[in-house]
A protein has these predicted regions:
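Acidic two-metal-ion nuclease catalytic site recognized across multiple nuclease folds
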Residues: 2, 145-150
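RNase H-like nuclease fold core
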Residues: 2-51, 62-63
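RNase H catalytic domain
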Residues: 14, 18, 58-147
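Short, conserved alpha-helix that lines the donor NDP-sugar binding/gating region
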Residues: 53, 57
């Protein structure tokens, strides 16, 4: 598989108030770690932190489809890196999801996964996810809904 077919996406979701105003951020990188594009957006609904983490993955999957096109995404291997061990473990099928709202978000991710060759989720330390976190805070501070081509 060529490097062009492997992507790393750092995601973060955050809520001020938990639940409260929420936003998501995503940093798309090639396999070597070179940034390709950054995204962030304020969420319309008030969310918890965990819901915002799920929404960040959903947001990123949709942005990847737009960025690469549906045909290319079918040969794309994506590793999501996030600082929420709970969400990464739930998305990898290691933890059960008890809350109905979270189950609905899981199903959205599951359905979007079919557009890609392979997707996995990795929990990383918060320090390694700083840029995605910054994007969330920028959105919440009113500088949101941006796309940056790097």
């Amino acid at each position: 598989m060529s490097k062009d077919n492997k992507i790393i996406v750092y995601t973060d979701g955050g809520s001020r108030g938990n639940p409260g105003p929420s936003a998501v951020g995503a940093v798309v990188c090639d396999e070597s770690g070179r940034k390709i594009k950054e995204y962030n957006q304020v969420l319309e609904d008030i969310s918890t932190n965990n819901e915002a983490e799920y929404e960040a993955v959903i947001f990123a999957l949709k942005k990847l489809r737009q960025l690469f096109g549906k045909e290319k995404t079918q040969s794309l291997e994506v590793q999501f890196r996030m600082d929420s061990q709970l969400i990464a473990s739930q998305l990898n099928g290691e933890y059960r999801i008890l809350e109905e709202r979270m189950q609905l978000l899981f199903v959205k991710v599951w359905n979007l996964k079919f557009d890609f060759k392979k997707i996995n989720f990795k929990s990383i330390p918060r320090e390694q996810n700083k840029r995605a976190d910054e994007l969330v805070n920028q959105a919440l501070d009113g500088q949101g809904e941006s796309e940056k081509l790097l």
